[in-house]
UniProtKB/Swiss-Prot annotation:
This is Tryptophan--tRNA ligase. It comes from the Archaea. Keywords: Aminoacyl-tRNA synthetase, ATP-binding, Cytoplasm, Ligase, Nucleotide-binding, Protein biosynthesis. It is an enzyme of class 6 (ligase). A motif ('HIGH' region) lies at residues 74-82. GO terms for molecular function: ATP binding; tryptophan-tRNA ligase activity. GO terms for cellular component: cytoplasm. SUPFAM superfamilies: Nucleotidylyl transferase. The keyword Metal-binding does not apply. GO terms for biological process: tryptophanyl-tRNA aminoacylation. It comes from Methanosarcina acetivorans (strain ATCC 35395 / DSM 2834 / JCM 12185 / C2A). Belongs to the class-I aminoacyl-tRNA synthetase family. The lineage of its organism: Archaea, Methanobacteriati, Methanobacteriota, Stenosarchaea group, Methanomicrobia. It catalyses: tRNA(Trp) + L-tryptophan + ATP = L-tryptophyl-tRNA(Trp) + AMP + diphosphate + H(+).
Amino acid sequence: MDTKLDPWSSSDITDYSKLFEEFGISPFENVLPEIPSPHMYMRRKVIFGHRDYEQIAEAMRTGAPFSVMDGFMPSGKVHLGHKMVMDQIVWHQEMGASAFVGIADREAFSVRGFSWQKCREIGVEEYILSLIALGFKPDGLIYFQSGCGSVKDLAFELGAKVNFSELSAIYGFSGETSLSHMLSVATQAADILQPQLEEFGGPKPVVVPVGPDQDPHLRLTRGLAGKMNMFRVEEREDVKTGRKYLSVRGKTAQKEALQELKKRIPGKVKLYEEHIDVLEYPDLAGLEKLVREVTVEFGGYAFIPPASTYHRFMSGLQGGKMSSSIPESQIALTDSPKEGAKKVKRAKTGGCVTLEEQKKLGGKPEECSVFELMLFHLIASDEELLEIKQECISGTRMCGSCKQLAAEKMQEFLKDHQEKRELAREHLDEYRIIYKD
């Protein structure tokens, strides 16, 4: 594999299409027609890939229960890159999802060395206030990992299903990696699976919107979901007859659970010591649902592997990668409106060197950080955005006018957002927030 995905470094991906082949991510455009009222990021191909999003789209269409889950490490200022994730959480919540947001203070403690108090301050002042200001509803759950007992308990159980060799293969961990860092990874997997615990309604589809650098967490969690489950359903083929059938297998399953399954599965079935062969039940999804129901009744886990969406990274305002450690490369949601506008005006564009060349050759919006701000955040109308793009390419729109428009819109957004942050502060006690004791 040529592409390295690291959740704790600033990844630079130049060819997103490689991720389809190397990591098994599917193109998002294939599932787009199934989504009612798709989000702006979906329509504009900012979200480029997914895993198992079909089940989320189906839940939206049918009104079935589903969840959106995401988290933020409280390690610095909340910026436009974080806003992208928050926008997707809020949209899924509006589409009917129960929403879960974890403040990854265990990760910040182990990876960044931050104190618990600092994690709490950053978590509230930066991330939680902005999340609420962007439209997060009070019926969602916000929690600090260190204060959430269900996450900590589940993380401990998950830790029994993964070893150092697996973590090394997925994350590149070495003998220098601290134990708390490895524990924070198990905690992230627990974050993702928590919405399917019985206290939150049991098994259901869960989507995690991420940048591709976070995919290692999804791969680990999907594998752990299967290892934790009481049963697994497999499609098999009789080596003698070539006939296909389904098999429900569970080495650690209670015999009573297997017997109950045998009673409920219609058609011809064969019960063995540790599995059931289902010979006349072609509906795989229906069988999986039945297996989950019986599993929960007998106190076992029946996790559905989490779905995920993958969005493009924002480039830095001066070109290259956006980095929290380089203030001029990004706009924080707590920057003053005037400072935000100034950063836009100083940003790198995709225009030509001279005005004459620009009129003759046109600009390159795909290389312009100012157009990217409009694409990701500032222009709500697809028609208006397309008009700006066409005028840029044709040479009838100059970089100065684009910067002025984007700067004005950024200033308006930051002013409005920061007013909403102060309102959010006044209403914090109306939200379900679990803090560290």
